[in-house]
Amino acid sequence: MIEKHGGIVLLIPHYANFEWITGMSSIMQEGDIPVQIYKPLHNKYMDAMFKRIRTRFGGYNVAKHSTAREIIKLCRDNKRVAVGMITDQSPNPNEAHYWTTFLNQDTVFMDGAERIAKLMDFPVFYCELQKQGRGYCRVRFDLITETPKATADGEITECFARRLEQTIRREPPYWFWSHKRWKLKREDTIQHG
């Protein structure tokens, strides 16, 4: 599918070993680039260390604030990309665009992955990790849509939320429960049209 569309978007939850994307180049065709979107750390030494760790197997780090620009540049250079985004974190209050019920809680989701998918018209996959034993996981790529521009606003993000909820209900211990998922309340956020 990367060959056909020039790229794909991978929606990745904080589930099991979510850092698997850093080694994804080993399962991609030569020349395809696994792109990892990340939020730079305030401590420049820790940031440099994490970037070094996450790129040692051929991954390409892109800072969250320059995602669209970097992906467009890679595509203009005729690079095929698999853009991996961990999308179940709580966004900043001014980035709180999509609210839904998730695990029986009013929950805001980041919608940056959906925006990138629509901008580039890249197919979108939900990445489900299944623990196979100590130190082993299997990743299943479930197609959400091959035509993101044809979807309604919020449809891709909602689909991600529903699939993640199913994954968590099936095996709750592997979700990263400690990342303050419900710290934002609707009344504390800027509402967008």
Region locations from a protein language model:
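Non-catalytic C-terminal accessory region of glycerolipid acyltransferases
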Residues: 2, 27, 52, 65-193
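Catalytic core of membrane glycerolipid acyltransferases/transacylases, capturing the structured
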Residues: 6-65, 92-101
